[in-house]
Amino acid sequence: MASVLDAQNDYVVADIGLADFGRAEIRIAETEMPGLMALREEFGASQPLKGARITGSLHMTIQTAVLIETLVALGAEVRWATCNIFSTQDHAAAAIAAAGIPVFAVKGESLAEYWDYVGSIFDWGDQTANMILDDGGDATMFALWGARVEAGEPLFEPSNAEEIEFVRALKEFLKRKPGYLTMSVAHIKGVSEETTTGVHRLYQIAKDGKLPFPAINVNDSVTKSKFDNLYGCKESLVDAIRRATDVMLAGKVACVAGFGDVGKGSAASLRQGGARVMVTEIDPICALQAAMEGYEVVTMEEAVQRCDIFVTATGNEDVITAEHMKAMKPMSIVCNIGHFDSEIQISALNNYKWTEIKPGTDLVEFPDGKQIIILAKGRLVNLGCATGHPSFVMSSSFTNQVLAQIELFTKNAEYKNEVYVLPKHLDEKVAALHLEKLGVKLTKLSKKQADYIGVSQEGPFKPDHYRY
């Protein structure tokens, strides 16, 4: 599907002719991303990322293009790939390629191409990456497994199509550039991780004592998880379902699996669209929150009998099984808004009849003739069937990413090989950079008031343990 359009150009995109279209949308997005634009103004002259060679793996969207160009404006060199085979916006990738930035991303790329492109973003010729910006942990795992294998650790036996292509691509890279990933890992100053799933991977690696460089958990910055995960999903989920199916949500019964920040936003999105919403949960605290918000909390076994629309938002695997889908009502809509495609047992449906209605929307027919609708083949529905979160909320997330990259690159000696979150004063800074755009006016504490509650007049205003 994808090919390098000119051997002299260091990119793979669907159509470089889309660059002007992409550039026009990037200009619009910049007006909705005040945090990133403020960082360009603040740090453009000092170039804090000069010398940084960032391997980036994150959805190649218009909003990500603004992030990439902010990193470059602050002095970094960047090589970029998407972190999901369906999430690329081809005009965004074309605009980045036309700007001379190496990018490897095509909407609908195969799993083989996906992992080959991960290899491409680590190939810096005679140099190596010295920073990683990741979403989901795939780039980090590629580098770490490469170094482990070269150190003599056996590579795991793949158990699914994704792992088969990962192992193949990694072996081919190691054969082509022996010792290179070991050298890369040694030079990497740190990784900033965007999403819940990738953060879980990092904490597990750190727990096992195998994290070779510091990591910043961007996901758990308040201005990421409580905004991108919550308010972003609140707008983008229903947008995706409507684009994919043209279904009327009002009056439908929907089930959201998981009531974390993403699940909360998803449930609110469906309720806002007029659906009656049920929630499934394993955690008694989240279940109680859902109940107090007025959602009916049920098991999936009950939900499949009653619901018309199903959304997984857990970060787990096998949340909706083949047996669940067999029990659903005809023409039920099934989709996922968690990072990976493990939440719905898509592979268990492979032997059934699939009919593509349009890209991202498939009818799956069971042996008894019943059909259900699968969106984005179980991958991220808001990016597979629509354009993801709005620019403004992504500005908040990506401002955290840029600050994390600056922090790790310029203050590397202050960090151990552990997983950190950004300090509270930077979290508050990210929020502050987005207030003017919304016409927000902050109240100023008097010295007496600040002393009374034990904070500085300039902040931080909350202790680290405060739950927003």
UniProtKB/Swiss-Prot annotation:
It comes from the Bacteria. This is Adenosylhomocysteinase. Substrate binds at T61, D135, E194, K224, D228. It comes from Novosphingobium aromaticivorans (strain ATCC 700278 / DSM 12444 / CCUG 56034 / CIP 105152 / NBRC 16084 / F199). Keywords: Cytoplasm, Hydrolase, NAD, One-carbon metabolism. GO terms for cellular component: cytosol. InterPro entries: Adenosylhomocyst_ase-like_sf, Adenosylhomocysteinase-like, Ado_hCys_hydrolase_NAD-bd, NAD(P)-bd_dom_sf, S-Ado-L-homoCys_hydrolase_CS. May play a key role in the regulation of the intracellular concentration of adenosylhomocysteine. The gene is ahcY. Its cofactor is NAD(+).
